[in-house]
């Protein structure tokens, strides 16, 4: 449990990095929070899937955070400095999460038949959503071309997805899990893996707010924001009083 707690704290710190980078573009944190809880702001589609067992923690770490690392390491060299510097810190944390997830799955795969099945079921749940995290195919991506032009992104969605699959296959063999893609194969001519068709209809439905947990996630965020109002108000009042003391002492 202490590892889960550490992970949650790191996620909060990561949010601060990214919100701070976004603030350099002229938007306030309050505005971004209002956009989030109103449903206007987009956020990663992967956060809208349920986690029914402990094995999901392992699959999320290995697959989801592994995909995030593959996507975010090149962003450390993004043309926009505040974003690139934030990514350097984020990637250091993601590497811990990825190793933690791999370790959880490895432990389960060395356990009972029930534990092995639990690990495999979790991999089955998270494999395809993790591949979709890189975004639509290059010929259907509305933002990739502009991001590449501005040198925010250095590789296309499909290039990053291919790299990710290339890393997953040998790791899956070590774990002893099966990647749930009957069409997955190595192309001898290109040396790259060919994957099955991703369900892009599901991906876009989740982005539209119709995923398994979209409504629940936003409602919890709204509730936390409302119940935490007194903390923000107290902090603001404390800052005001400290400013008055500093001014009086000057």
Language model region names:
Residues 15-78:
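Active-site-adjacent scaffolding segments
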Residues 57-67, 86, 93-97, 160:
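Short, contiguous, pocket-lining structural segments
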Residues 1-13:
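Single conserved hydrophobic/aromatic residue that forms the stacking wall/gate
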Residues 117-250:
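Extended, helix-rich structural scaffolds rather than catalytic motifs
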Residues 71-89, 103-118, 136-150:
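Inter-helical turn/loop segments and adjacent helix faces that build the functional surface
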Residues 35-61, 111-115, 126-152:
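Acidic/His metal-coordination segments adjacent to aromatic residues that form catalytic metal sites
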Residues 10, 14-20, 89-107, 122-132:
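Alpha-helical scaffold segments in carbohydrate-active enzymes
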């Amino acid at each position: 449990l202490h590892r889960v707690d550490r992970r949650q704290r790191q996620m909060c710190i990561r949010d601060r990095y990214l919100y701070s980078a976004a603030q350099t573009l002229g938007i306030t944190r309050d505005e971004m929070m209002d956009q989030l809880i109103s449903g206007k702001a987009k956020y990663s589609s992967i956060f809208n899937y349920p986690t029914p067992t402990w094995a999901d923690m392992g699959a999320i770490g290995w697959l989801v955070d592994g995909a995030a690392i593959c996507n975010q390491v090149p962003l450390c060299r993004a043309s926009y400095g505040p974003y690139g510097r934030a990514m350097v810190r984020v990637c250091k944390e993601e590497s811990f999460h990825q190793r933690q997830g791999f370790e959880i799955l490895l432990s389960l795969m060395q356990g009972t038949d029930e534990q092995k099945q639990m690990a495999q079921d979790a991999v089955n749940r998270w494999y395809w959503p993790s591949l979709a995290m890189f975004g639509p195919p290059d010929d259907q991506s509305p933002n990739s071309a502009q991001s590449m032009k501005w040198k925010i992104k250095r590789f296309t969605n499909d290039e990053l997805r291919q790299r990710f699959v290339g890393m997953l296959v040998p790791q899956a063999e070590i774990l002893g899990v099966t990647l749930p893609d009957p069409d997955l194969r190595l192309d001898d001519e290109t040396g790259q893996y060919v994957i099955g068709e991703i369900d892009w209809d599901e991906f876009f439905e989740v982005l539209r707010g119709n995923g398994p947990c979209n409504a629940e996630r936003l409602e919890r965020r709204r509730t936390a924001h409302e119940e935490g109002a007194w903390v923000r108000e107290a902090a603001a009042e404390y800052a005001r009083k400290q400013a008055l003391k500093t001014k009086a002492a000057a």
